[in-house]
Structure formats: C-alpha cells, structure tokens
Amino acid sequence: MKPTSQYPQAVPNPPKNSLSDDTLVISSEFIQRLAVLTRKLGYVFNDLSLAKLALTHRSFDSKKNYERLEFLGDALLGMIVGEALYHRYPTQNEGRLTRMRATLVRQESLVIIAQNLELSNQLILGVGERKGGGRNRASILADAVESLIGAIYLDSQDMNITRECVLSWYGDLIDNVNDQKALKDAKSRLQEWLQSKQFDLPHYELMETRGNAPHQLFVVRCQVNIINCPDITESGESRRIAEQKAAELMINQLHKLPGVPKKRR
C-alpha cells in the first residue's frame, strides 16, 4: 500500500473557509481535511483534484461531481470483493458466493465503512443537501465509498494498491460473512444476541423526523437493558435504515463491554 506522507503546501492566503462546501479551491483547509482522511484510507493522493472530485456531491456541482467515479468504483468493488471471496471460500458454490458478495457490497455495509472512514465530515455538499441532513444520508455515504475506490484506482494506476486499500477497509467483514449470522440484518442479530443471554429485547424509538419528503431524515434511538451500555442514536433515509444502523453500532458496543454483561435493575 502506498505509504502515508504529508501533502504539499496549499495555495498562499486561501479564502477563509475555502472548503466549507462553497468553493473547490485547493486550500489549507482542504489539505488538512484530506490529511485526516488519508490516515483512514491508507492512501495518499498524487492528484488532489481527483480526491476533491471523489468527495463532491452533485448538489454542489451538477457537472463536476463524483458520479462517474462512483460508476467506476462500483465495478471495481464488485470485482475486488468477488475475487476475495473466491479465494477465501474455495468450497462455496456460485450461488452462495453471489449472496455473500451482495451482503458485502450492499448499502448497509458501505455505510459502515463510510462511518469507519469518517466520511461524513469530508463530503462536499450543496447548501440545501447539507441542511437536509445529507452528511448522514446512507445513499450519499455509500456512493462516496465507491467514488473513492474509483479515484484511488485512477490516481495510483495500480490494481494491487486499490485492492489492498479496499480489503483493509473491510477488515474482518469478509472473514465473518461466511457465518450465517453475519448474513442476517443487524436488528435480527442484535435480538438473537440478547435472547441468547436472556436479556430483554431492544427498544427502538423514533426521536425526530427532519426535512420533507422525499429527502427526510429519520433519527432513531436504540436502547438495551444492560449496565454500562449507553443508548445509540442514529439517522437514516428511512426509519428501517436508521434502526439497522443503530442496531449495528449497538452490537459493536456490546462486544466491547468488559466482563459479563449485567441487566439493569
């Protein structure tokens, strides 16, 4: 993988807040934001304008945005994940491999990757999309992951580097996808985990709905009756998506609890 290094100096005296989604000047602010993302990606861009394009939503620029990179990244992602599954699971048939790949490249999986990469703070959005909760919109986060894959491939001109980056983002998701439980949605997995430990079922509460259809954002809270396990609040384009995201984070939180989980009195 391409080693992490410092980016070149930005243009002198850039406009204040020059990457507050209102301009695409390569400024010191952009350099700083990209440096943070670089550490998460595990890749340093040679062409900063390509990195910028990969983060630009069509609401900011209807012509110069990440949609073409997303198209390329989608194709690369399917190939990289498919190849990894082919070698990782030599005894699985075509149908099973297809379902496993679908699980790994679906929106919910890409949103998890986007959250791990902290992409929401890096996206370049139009004013309306920002106000409408676009930074947490599942479709935008998933698309941005794919666009970054396309951008890394074009920037590096190296499939091996691209593959290494993508697989590092997935971590142990590919190893765990062979587990039938990993193929179930997060809410089902959370419920089964709690039932297996004789805990109460999780409680989901719709906290608020932001914006107007078709660009509404639903905010949901997930609660479990376990000591030292704070509530999880997440948002999504639908209540179902928000609940799934909250359940996924709750599962991760439960797995990190020290000792034996205990029920609240």
Swiss-Prot record:
InterPro entries: dsRBD_dom, RNase_III, RNase_III_dom, RNase_III_sf
Compartments, record wording: Cytoplasm
Boundaries of every RNase III domain copy: 34-157
Binding site for Mg(2+): 70, 143, 146
Keywords: Cytoplasm, Endonuclease, Hydrolase, Magnesium, Metal-binding, mRNA processing, Nuclease, RNA-binding, rRNA processing, rRNA-binding, tRNA processing
Names of required cofactors: Mg(2+)
Organism domain of life: Bacteria
Gene Ontology CC, one term: cytoplasm
GO biological process, one term: mRNA processing
Annotated active site: 74, 146
Principal subcellular localisation of the protein: cytoplasm
Span of domain DRBM: 185-256
EC number: 3.1.26.3
One Gene Ontology term of the molecular function aspect: rRNA binding
Catalysed reactions, as listed in the record: Endonucleolytic cleavage to 5'-phosphomonoester
EC class of the enzyme, as a word: hydrolase
Family according to the record: Belongs to the ribonuclease III family.
Primary role: Digests double-stranded RNA. Involved in the processing of primary rRNA transcript to yield the immediate precursors to the large and small rRNAs (23S and 16S). Processes some mRNAs, and tRNAs when they are encoded in the rRNA operon. Processes pre-crRNA and tracrRNA of type II CRISPR loci if present in the organism.
Subunit structure comment from the entry: Homodimer.
Protein name: Ribonuclease 3
